[in-house]
């Protein structure tokens, strides 16, 4: 007679070492995917993110990791609508008020104060940002959260930059537009009467930028090298402001060349400088000082050097005006 293995090793079902009654997976209804204890069912939007939270520590208020990306043109995708999970609705506890210092920028007062811009393309998320729907006098108004950790310009606004030439109706030349994250917020700020001429050299980022422009009639994507501004002179008119984020060793010279072609007298300039991209052998303070001196040599009057290292390590925003006219 053979050995009965059913009662050896792990033990019988109800015996010592066995699963015990009620522990059979078939009886409990639990699958391999259910081994972890269940989490509370947090809804997206139960808790806003304050200025200081880069990614948050999970619910409440944080996006599920599985929801970060969707199909490119589908709900939640970079180039498509954000879908039902792409934003949160404003309610009685959420108030959106104009920024006290900057035209075209707003602050959402809810579970934490958050920078937002009024969406020029309601229903469309650009980089998975949260969206707030607020009841207006005639219809709902959608605002988009502006994350300072994802945008150098957003960081400058969060840190109360002195001069903000980007405002409703402005024409902006944006150098180093990348995938269009900050471009989309600039588009919101300048509104339908303004324009954003977004220059990007990378073909891959340029494709994403084109997707952003499809939903925004005031964005003019230009796939070109910002070192040669004459190549897009047939597209770009005289502008009110230049914002630059090209992260190149000769960035100050690139800005100066573009200003010579397109920036009006007394026009605004904001340049994001990453110290290690200019000269990794020098301390950041020395790099910033050298770039400011280069700008001054090209008719810029620099008004402020703003350290945004709190949001972007070894970065500074230099703010100035071009060919300032004497009073």
From Swiss-Prot:
Catalysed reaction equations from the record: L-glutaminyl-[histone H2A] + S-adenosyl-L-methionine = N(5)-methyl-L-glutaminyl-[histone H2A] + S-adenosyl-L-homocysteine + H(+)
Compositionally biased intervals (Gly residues): 73-90
GO BP of this protein: box C/D sno(s)RNA 3'-end processing
Keyword line: Methylation, Methyltransferase, Nucleus, Ribonucleoprotein, RNA-binding, rRNA processing, S-adenosyl-L-methionine, Transferase
Residue numbers spanned by region Disordered: 1-96
Binding site for S-adenosyl-L-methionine: 181-182, 200-201, 225-226, 245-248
Annotated signal sequence range: none
EC number annotated for this UniProt entry: 2.1.1.-
Protein task: S-adenosyl-L-methionine-dependent methyltransferase that has the ability to methylate both RNAs and proteins. Involved in pre-rRNA processing. Utilizes the methyl donor S-adenosyl-L-methionine to catalyze the site-specific 2'-hydroxyl methylation of ribose moieties in pre-ribosomal RNA. Site specificity is provided by a guide RNA that base pairs with the substrate. Methylation occurs at a characteristic distance from the sequence involved in base pairing with the guide RNA.
HAMAP family: RNA_methyltransf_FlpA
Full protein name: rRNA 2'-O-methyltransferase fibrillarin
Originating species: Giardia intestinalis (Giardia lamblia)
